[in-house]
Design a protein with these regions (language model features):
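Conserved N-terminal beta1-alpha1 strand-loop-helix module at the mouth
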Residues: 1-78, 82-85, 89-91, 259-283
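Short amphipathic alpha-helices and their capping/turn segments at secondary-structure boundaries
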Residues: 1-14, 48-49, 131-142, 230-238
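Short, well-ordered coil/turn segments that N-cap beta-strands
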Residues: 14-18, 53-56, 86-88, 117-119, ...
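Conserved, mostly hydrophobic/aromatic
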Residues: 20, 58, 93, 121, ...
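Active-site-proximal loop/turn and secondary-structure-junction residues that shape catalytic pockets
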Residues: 24-28, 62-66, 96-98, 125-127, ...
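Conserved anion-binding
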Residues: 26, 94, 98-194
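Active-site-adjacent beta->alpha loops and helix N-cap segments on the catalytic face
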Residues: 67-82, 99-104, 127-140, 200-209, ...
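A C-terminal functional module that forms or caps the active site or interfaces directly
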Residues: 199-246, 250, 254
Length: 291
């Protein structure tokens, strides 16, 4: 199966739009890292396994693995292999984008068949279409893309909302994404060339769905970033497909608010609660969870 088929099958079998962002953060005075006594891969895999019945995919944030050097990259390879063994779709949150030859190397690293191979990748469109061409080429071999269009962070509007001719810059990017994906629309009416649209900007999300009627929307912002379930499902179709909602810290670090402090147990409860809250929001909006 290709990326869209695998993702849709996972969503339907688990009745979910939820995915897990695997963000094993570095220890700071304000942010917890990996629990004491846990190897990095063990912590991530325990949370992934616990959340697996309630999520369609994982989205490892590569920076948190890269920051730990060789040990971190070995852990990333182990985490991806473990997730694939559970039948989960894997999305590399890499936000790559460079001149053609460099992008080709990134595409080989994360959309090829090596240690860090994933089903899809997040990419940065700032360098233009020639920089994204090597990634788009991988769609033909069954991979997926999520292009940064309107991101969830507070200062995203500094550039993304600037007025280009006749529309904001982010809308111009969305129109390009629609063009890149139009040749790959499959049986579900969805293209594997998707977009990242933050739930923290629901009005933008509604407009994005108009511009991207066939794209799968990767939705950050739910959970620790403060977006509501109602805002997070704006881009989902009536059948619940076409959108996946990410949560990272609220699942990875749910154990900090639990009585027993066990990462897996707390993550499972948080993932179930997330799935059910999003499904309630879908129904309230006149939509249905994926079935």
């Amino acid at each position: 199966m290709d990326f869209v088929e695998r993702l849709v099958a996972a969503q339907r079998s688990k009745h979910t739009v939820a995915i897990l962002g695997v963000d094993p953060q570095l220890d700071t005075r304000t942010t917890p890292g990996v629990p004491s006594g846990y190897p990095l891969a063990r912590f991530c895999c325990e949370v992934i396994e616990a959340c697996a019945p309630h999520i369609a995919a994982i989205k490892p944030q590569l920076a948190f693995f890269e920051a730990r050097g060789l040990d971190g990259m070995r852990a990333l390879a182990e985490v991806l292999k473990f997730a694939r063994g559970l039948g989960l779709v894997t999305i590399a949150d890499a936000k790559r984008g460079d001149i053609g030859t460099t992008s080709a190397a990134y595409a080989e690293a994360f959309l090829g068949d090596g240690d860090f191979a994933c089903d899809a990748i997040t990419i940065n469109p700032y360098l233009g279409s020639d920089a994204l061409a090597p990634f788009v080429a991988r769609v033909r071999s069954g991979r997926g893309l999520f292009v940064l269009v309107k991101t969830s962070n507070p200062s995203s509007g500094e550039f993304q909302d600037l007025e280009a001719p006749h529309r904001p810059l982010w809308e111009a990017v969305a129109e390009r994404v629609h063009g890149w994906g139009s040749d790959f629309i499959g049986a579900e009416g969805l293209t594997p060339v998707g977009a990242v649209i933050g739930a923290t900007y629901p009005a933008h999300a509604r407009r994005a769905r108009e511009l991207l009627p066939d794209s799968i929307i990767l939705v950050p912002g739910y959970g620790a970033q403060g977006a509501s379930a109602e805002d997070s499902i704006v881009t989902a179709r009536a059948d619940g497909l076409g959108a996946i909602v990410n949560a990272s810290r609220s699942l990875m670090y749910a154990y900090l608010k639990s009585s027993d402090g066990v990462p897996g147990t707390a993550a499972a409860a948080a993932a179930l609660a997330m799935r059910e809250e999003l499904n309630r929001a879908l129904r309230a909006a006149g939509k249905s969870p994926p079935t």
